[in-house]
Amino acid sequence: MTLQTIQESKLTRREVEVLGSTMSYLQAGTEGPNVLFLHGNPTSSYIWRDIIPHVEPQAKCFAPDLIGFGRSGKPDIDYRFADQVRYLDAFLETIGLNKMVIVAQDWGTALAFHYAARFPEKILGLAFMEFIHPMPNWDNFHQRPEARELFKAFRTPGMGEKMILEDNFFIERVLPAAVTRKLSDAEMAEYRAPFPTPQSRKPILMFPRELPIAGEPRDMYAMCEDDQAALRASNYPKLLFYGDPGALISPEVATRFASGFQNCQLVRLGTGSHYLQEDHPHTIGAAIRQWIDLLI
């Protein structure tokens, strides 16, 4: 697919009422299977902008902004993972998605795994990268020791609030550091826009505190263990992308997990950290399109 074709692709922005708030989403494509794109922290549907155009000629694509992110509403809620589940479930019911392929990264994978564990009959396939999984100890989290210390600080009362809410550290430092290329001023402006105030950044703060590490938080850890068990038992097609060295998922970890999944294809993207969509959008998009061809 050429750059001109990508630029000519029509991504339509829509908005629906969900649980007393609103959720914004990108939509493209009119024929083929439903494909749901789920982003992570602190991004939005914007991160799929150069991937969806590869897929939309053969699929109906939907990329929501999670509640509290992007152009979606910011209701007065705790923004725990359970809240994200409630709003995503209601969003999918509102727009009428039933059977679907899910493409996910970061916290989008935790949402995808949890949805697939509860509704396996609705899953046509699952493509994912840099995924959330239960980590028995901090050595299992991230490829860089300094990142582990940083996320410990995010989870520390007072320190996390100062760094993420007041200093906007996740947007200004974590995001650009986890992309191999330099994000443009326009791209950074798009990612900054949803979070102009400390209060607006609460959703960003809550996700690091929900990471299932060393048995905590207990409810999240138990849920993620159950969801991983369901994922290993499932036989729907899977497509696992990984970068080198990766962030949450190294090439070695990706290979190990893939060997424990049924019907899982591995795709090596080359140099990359966490936000692989920003470094390899066209490779990811083309691979998803070819994979969906095999599904249908």
Positions of predicted regions on the chain:
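Flexible "cap/lid" subdomain of the alpha/beta-hydrolase fold that forms the substrate-access gate
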Residues: T2-E15, L19-Y25, N34, F62, ...
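Conserved HGGG/HGGXW glycine-rich cap/lid loop of the alpha/beta-hydrolase fold
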Residues: Q27-R71
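Short amphipathic alpha-helical segment that frequently serves as the phosphate-/nucleotide-binding helix
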Residues: P42, T255, G285
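A short, glycine- and basic residue-enriched loop/turn
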Residues: S44-S45, A110, G272-S273
